[in-house]
């Protein structure tokens, strides 16, 4: 067998390949069969992870800004707009450690009008999964699934979500290969109890037992081997958010008893995310935390910066950090702040991340992954 890199021992060549930044994966794979097999091997990614070479990325389904879209967006150049006249959504990437922003390649063959409105996003391994939402050209609910592979640099279609086309459902992944979906509402505005799981590698959906309660506009997080579905409301109480949650044990394949006091009544669960040691959420003025000790009390841990208090979108980052993207006023540009871990007894500090104008649009969904 030929060496990976002529003139170098294979162990040295592998060390070189593992240091290629993720945007270069596609080019490296195209060099030769040996390099492609090397990058596709589990050992390659284990070496990267073990050597601290992985990169933390935040993927954001974000609207394009009118002032910048004309110069940077193929979607805008093709004049693809939602029927409402709003700017199209695309997938933006942010590296919190370097502060750099970028776009994922567009998928004109699969998503000619941009990302679906109100879609959900989840990360599994080196793939990013986009699920459901509304067709931007018709506002019809979609059951489509699209997958971006960071290794190949390509988009592909996944198996569509089975059952009634649902909107505003809970969604989360185990970060490995499975995406969970639950609740939402059907085309008749009926809140749903049904749930299912999607195996990304097999491209297969499997039904899960129904939840105990109907949950429209609920939030999904994955923590401690369980898919936690928080809040939402029933058909009869439309728009009146409840405070309970229930969790699906992925190993035992059953739902836990309903936790009746997961949230304060009337609080939208959109900003609820799972951190290293518990759950975070954003109120109108603070970030609150609920630990894993079993207590139901939410405690304020930091005041929310005024620049991100409107329509905040929260993302838990490795190392006990929390990223919040939001605006100071309706229709205003979105800012980005990162809440750093506690340093002794001092208040947890915020670090403001620079946001270029073209990445200051509204964020409708987000997730964190490591490549």
Regions found by a protein language model. Name each.
Residues 1-371:
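Kelch-like beta-propeller repeat domains
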